[in-house]
From Swiss-Prot:
Keywords of this entry: Antimicrobial, Bacteriolytic enzyme, Disulfide bond, Glycosidase, Hydrolase, Secreted
Organism per entry: Lophura leucomelanos (Kalij pheasant)
Keyword Hydrolase: yes
Transmembrane region(s): none
Protein name as catalogued: Lysozyme C
Length: 129
């Protein structure tokens, strides 16, 4: 599923991401835009043999099990396929674990490069939330 901007903002808010660990909703919507272009089915292979999955491009080396990543830790205790669902609950729950891990949203390279330090309120502007 490819989410609309406001549709995704509303879903993320409903699942408790607004100001989770101090990150406003705009940060999460911005991250999703530049990680997956709001597409829940996005997958991208990394040079280390791991794969990033879903709307927030969650990595199989650490966070989920895809059955093909050597030494996978599966810290969210989920199959990576769960992160490709049109229902973003699994992605959001795992993202909460990731952002609580010590580096905050810096865990997402696209957030660090494209969203961090910018006015992320534009990502929720005009949305009925």
């Amino acid at each position: 599923k490819v989410y609309g901007r406001c549709e995704l903002a509303a879903a993320m808010k409903r699942l408790g991401l607004d100001n989770y660990r101090g990150y406003s909703l705009g940060n999460w919507v911005c991250a999703a835009k530049y990680e997956s272009n709001f597409n829940t089915h996005a997958t991208n292979r990394n040079t280390d043999g791991s794969t990033d999955y879903g709307i927030l491009q969650i990595n199989s080396r650490w966070w989920c099990n895809d059955g093909k990543t050597p030494g996978s830790r599966n810290l969210c205790h989920i199959p990576c396929s769960a992160l490709l669902s049109s229902d973003i609950t699994a992605s959001v729950n795992c993202a909460k674990k990731i952002v609580s891990d010590g580096n905050g949203m810096n865990a997402w390279v696209a957030w660090r490069n494209r969203c961090k330090g910018t006015d992320v309120s534009v990502w929720t502007r005009g949305c009925r939330l």
